[in-house]
Regions:
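Metalloprotease/metallohydrolase-associated module, dominated by Zn2+-dependent proteases
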Residues: 46-133
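Generic detector of short, locally flexible boundary/turn motifs and exposed helical patches
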Residues: 2-3, 55
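Membrane-embedded alpha-helical segments that form the functional core of polytopic membrane enzymes
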Residues: 3-16, 83, 87-88
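Small-residue-rich helix-interface/hinge motifs
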Residues: 10-57
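Terminal, membrane-proximal amphipathic helices
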Residues: 1, 17, 131-133
């Protein structure tokens, strides 16, 4: 298989698995989803009810850090460029997840929800496509 095709396939699958892992946590903890959006900055994501998970440390950690498990795919075959795309996408693509987690942890309980709701409003303004649920 051509090198560029393997890289593109690895990136595509890594992005899909990253977002599906977020969705798995959302469904497992029954966090209500407000909308699925596609934006020009954050690519693809889910807007969820912030009041449901903001003050629960376990949900917060799993929602933001569980997709990093895909970084372990490199150990399947470290010589294959396809598997290098999983840690690459999940570390660099997950920087937003890191930022949101640590920003949330620095705010008080009341401010967390207000800040998250204002972020949701900003994301909705930059949405290219939105599907409300």
């Amino acid at each position: 298989m051509d090198l560029m095709l393997r890289i593109l396939l690895g990136i595509t699958i890594a992005i899909i698995l990253h977002e599906l892992t977020h969705l798995l946590v959302i469904f497992y903890y029954k966090i209500p989803v407000k909308a699925i959006i596609l934006t020009k900055w954050t690519a693809f994501g889910f807007l969820i009810e912030n009041e449901n998970y903001m003050n629960d440390g376990k949900k917060l950690i799993l929602l933001h850090f569980l997709p990093l498990i895909w970084c372990l795919m490199i150990f399947i075959n470290p010589n294959e460029v396809f598997f290098y795309m999983f840690p690459f996408v999940n570390i660099f693509g997950g920087l937003g997840d890191f930022y949101f987690y640590f920003k949330i942890k620095t705010l008080s309980s009341k401010m967390r929800i207000e800040w998250a709701n204002s972020c949701d409003e900003k994301l909705l303004k930059s949405a290219i496509w939105k599907r409300e649920i």
